[in-house]
Amino acid sequence: MERAEAEAILDGDRETAVALLLRVGELIEANRRLEARVAELEQRLNRSSRNSSLPPSQDPPAAPPRPKQPPSGRKRGGQAGHEGRHRRLLPLERLDEVVEHWPERCRSCAHVFEERELLDAAEPWRHQVTELPPIAVTVSEHRLHRLRCPVCAAETRAELPAGVPRSAFGPRLQAAVATLAVRNRVSRRDTLELMRDLFGAELATGSIDAIIERAGDALADPHATLLEQIRSAAAVNIDETGWRTAGQRRTLWGALTERTALFRIAPDRHEREAKALLGDDFAGITCSDRWWAYNYLHPERRQLCWAHLARDFTAHSEGLAAQKEFGKAGLEITGRLFAAWDAYRNNGDRTHLLEQIAPLQAELRTLLEQAARKSTKTKYHRQFANNLLKHWPALWTFSHTDGVEPTNNHAERGLRGAVIHRKLSLGSQSQRGEQTIERLLSASITCRLQQRSLFAYLTSVLTANIRGDPIPTLTRSSPGT
């Protein structure tokens, strides 16, 4: 429409002018919504492990590669001045065999050494060889005889004594199978091959499944004890990830302390599942990401993960105009925060940590309050700023509370093995399968945190289960004890 036509309508036809103005207003509003939708889709399209919670395995093909570390200028291998490391010789009391070797002839003149000359020999050069002996399972047959009573003619058969497994496999073999499955993530068929080739044990796929389920059943009490320890802990790292049961979507929750780990498979990521895991009266501090299911927790009893916040700020720094400046400023503050935390971990000076954190708090508060204003055009970083202000105390719990870190890396590392297990095994196939993997994963990660042997622990559990003794727990006071 030309200007003259518009002026003619305005001068001559008031109703038409009003209708056109209303239509223009509708189009402006529609355009605003479309621009917001385009911005949202572009932001979603640009998501990667650099700027969101996506794992690196889900990065899109167009995602920029991770920045490479600059070359150090050093050659490969040992560096000049580096103290070399060699395999240490075992002491004599730990050797199974000592074989003496003597030279027969002089390498210079071919003199044949006599026995009396061996007495003048110097300290020998020692070379130790570590070898696996031929390994084979032992098979014991228990014969239960039946006798007829000469008095009443009743027949009585002997019973298996306590400590003899009712199944066809002993506790050490069962513990080995369970360890291969949960810790080493070996498939059923590969487990059959390993047991046959290494130990001469012939098993079937059904036997493997039965052994793993039996191990899960035996871990019922230790798993319940772990749950009690988590709910009474002073600080807990918690996270969740996807799971599959019979092809249906489920959620694997993980709660970890410094020395324990507990996993639970639930229907979803809802707040009720977080409460079911931590308990209704949990009084400790929870470190997590900003997932809404944790919002029922008081901000002063939480610690938000700064690694997640760094990725959020990275996403905003890749936006436009004010959003980009907001993201860059947030990343700069985050970098200084991690530097202060690294210094604290090296020197343990909390007073100095608080002195370094104080100006960062002031800068971030100003940044967030400016971004949270209604005049901020980009709603994404306005909403993000409002969310951080709402949970403000949860940003700084690590700075004044022992045993709390600024990131949730502890929980994410604990879940990593479970995620790999899910991808290799395709999850679970039944509710009992869920229960079994919950308990085995909990025992596996807890043993790793406590620097214990999972195989040795499962052996003790299965042995106690066979004998009817109390099941050993996973409570340990310190590493190596």
Describe the residue ranges of each PLM region.
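Short, flexible loop/hinge motifs at secondary-structure junctions
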Residues: 1-168, 238, 244, 288
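Catalytic center-proximal scaffold of phosphoryl-transfer enzymes
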Residues: 11, 39, 86-87, 103, ...
